[in-house]
A protein has these predicted regions:
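Extended alpha-helical targeting/anchoring segments
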Residues: 1-211
């Protein structure tokens, strides 16, 4: 599975790691390399990823020291058991006088599960989805209690399974942009949830774990 870092702060160093752009893993190394290159060169995936990186930089900028926001890496292909993603890393230095709650307020919800512009995107999501997401796309993590150091590590509640009243459930989704294709978005959702189906011995043969 590939849970995403929502925001991390260690001794005043902030980090976001946007994930946007997905392909399944290949059945062998040759297919895996082909799918990685397809992902890396897809204009739709590139545009979506750059938009979310910019949003992440803006979010960190709200609580960062002026001039400290830095894009450490951009659009690397990162491989997981069933899928590969385009990933980036944005860092910054926390501004004096800011605390962990300021960091959470500036970054939650992350743009990769809300969209941009963030407030308007959330309004559209609420009108279209018709029900609460509950834990899905929220955040899970910890906040340090040291008054002399701001430390936190929050992950996005995706690729996660929940138990309620004896029932297991999970959710998966994809970012919808102007150039999205409904069939491809559905395939992405299936690929993202493959690990959950495999855990429950319901894995599909066409989405194998890469070995």
């Amino acid at each position: 599975a590939s849970p995403e870092v929502m925001v991390r702060c260690e001794k005043g160093r902030l980090q976001l790691s946007p994930i946007a752009g997905t392909r399944r893993r290949g059945r062998d190394d040759l297919e895996d390399a082909r799918l990685a290159e397809e992902l890396r060169s897809d204009p739709k995936e590139q545009a979506e990823h750059v938009m979310l990186v910019d949003l992440g930089r803006n979010d960190l900028g709200r609580v960062a020291q002026p001039g400290s926001v830095n894009l450490e890496r951009c659009m690397d292909v990162e491989r997981f058991s069933h899928v590969m993603h385009l990933t980036s890393r944005v860092t910054a230095r926390l501004a004096p006088g800011r605390d962990a709650l300021d960091v959470l307020a500036a970054t939650f919800p992350t743009g990769t599960v809300s969209g941009a512009p963030k407030v308007r995107a959330m309004e559209i999501i609420r009108s279209l989805e018709g029900r609460a997401r509950r834990p899905y796309a929220g955040c899970i993590g910890w906040l340090g209690l040291d008054k002399d150091s701001v430390d936190l590590d929050m992950g996005i509640a995706i690729r996660s399974m929940w138990s309620r009243e004896g029932h297991l459930f999970w959710q998966a989704g994809g970012g919808i942009v102007h150039d999205s294709d409904a069939a491809l978005e559905w395939k992405e959702v299936c690929n993202k949830s493959a690990i959950m189906r495999l855990v429950l011995e319901e894995g599909d043969d066409h989405v194998p774990a890469h070995r």
